[in-house]
């Protein structure tokens, strides 16, 4: 298989699975050998076993980190700091793309960046949607769920001090009714207290805006 044939096969896919190359009578050993050669030559990136992305200057589409995160762990969605920064709810640039999963926690360092997968209970895997990302798509937590996931995962995350440290902004983008409903799913006093604090911060931000 020539490299040009690989590019034709994957088309505009930002990330591809090695199984895509196994159609027909082609030998799996041959495919593995070719992928290894292209990786060593810097033509493709190996993200994890069986998962690859074409490297510049050959790539047609640069993979969005959120899409890559979804592909690295199928049963996951982007949440916490990464989703909050995406929605403009925190000003900080996040060094790693953070997702939640019912599987084991994991931190992966790849050519596309660092990806963290935090564990939550299976019954808490809700409150996310398919989100458009400049021609790509990925599962991303709703703004309210992203904040609740972070509070749940962070020791002391429900404290006023911690929530102030996040430098939350644009809180008018949060639906407080949705926040309360989703917090009930967690069923913990910590989340209930956090919602009260977030409501307080939202009202304070609104008052400060009126003064300006």
Language model features by range: what are they?
Residues 1-75, 111:
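Short beta-edge/loop segments at beta->alpha junctions of small alpha/beta modules
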Residues 18, 80, 179:
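Generic structural marker for isolated residues within well-ordered, non-membrane alpha-helices
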Residues 21, 38, 83-84, 183:
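Hydrophobic alpha-helix position signal
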Residues 24, 41, 87, 166-169, ...:
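Residues at alpha-helix termini
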Residues 26, 88, 152-156:
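Hydrophobic/aromatic-lined pockets within catalytic cores
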Residues 27-28, 90, 189:
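Short coil/loop linkers at secondary-structure junctions
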Residues 46-55, 65-126:
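Short gly/ser-rich loop at a beta-strand->alpha-helix junction or flexible surface loop bordering the NTP-binding
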Residues 128-212:
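Hydrophobic alpha-helical interaction segments
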